[in-house]
Amino acid sequence: MSRDDQLFTLWGKLNDRQKDNFLKWMKAFDVEKTYQKTSGDIFNDDFFDIFGDRLITHHFSSTQALTKTLFEHAFNDSLNESGVISSLAESRTNPGHDITIDSIKVALKTEAAKNISKSYIHVSKWMELGKGEWILELLLERFLEHLENYERIFTLRYFKISEYKFSYQLVEIPKSLLLEAKNAKLEIMSGSKQSPKPGYGYVLDENENKKFSLYFDGGAERKLQIKHLNLEHCIVHGVWDFILPPP
């Protein structure tokens, strides 16, 4: 039975409500959209089409950005469907890589804040810092050890431009850039009322300009954030732009 025959047969089995939902879902693929491959060595043209279709399928039933877990699965499925060998890490609480692509361990991040910057990346939770000693030098060492668990890092950034217009951006954060944190200038925020007191690790270029900051958050989660990471130091692999029709 051909694909068209299968669709016709299935259509006849749906009730009116299911047919209405099916039509809405099909119309999702007819939205105004642009998929741009801008750089990179892993992804082929098929991946950008497949992943873009998965993004629009998600937004057929949700007004929220793709969560990290949904990103991981959509990313992995799109890679495999496009002919790239990929598999998710077996443990979802793995303190390192999230996915393996052609035998390369990769960490995945997402960013979807309402006030997201076009020029600077912010990762609100890079890793948990645990309940050990709160000494910035030791925390920095833990971050550098964490980097040993993966070779590449990709973050999916979501921009809501208007009620019906949104965009996704796939960016690679070079591991070599993050490794520059070994020379970070550490500063404890002594005036903070938080306990333990938070601190910063500033990564500067040769002209003392800030490349990015490590923020050791001493709050309830005790986590490491990456702040003010200039997009100019990263690789934008692709952009997906969508304009949805009004309901």
UniProtKB/Swiss-Prot annotation:
Keywords: Endonuclease, Hydrolase, Magnesium, Nuclease, Restriction system. One of its GO terms (molecular function) is type II site-specific deoxyribonuclease activity. It catalyses: Endonucleolytic cleavage of DNA to give specific double-stranded fragments with terminal 5'-phosphates. It comes from the Bacteria. Its EC number is 3.1.21.4. GO terms for biological process: DNA restriction-modification system. InterPro entries: SmaI. The keyword Glycoprotein does not apply. Its cofactor is Mg(2+); K(+). It is an enzyme of class 3 (hydrolase). This is Type II restriction enzyme SmaI. It comes from Serratia marcescens.
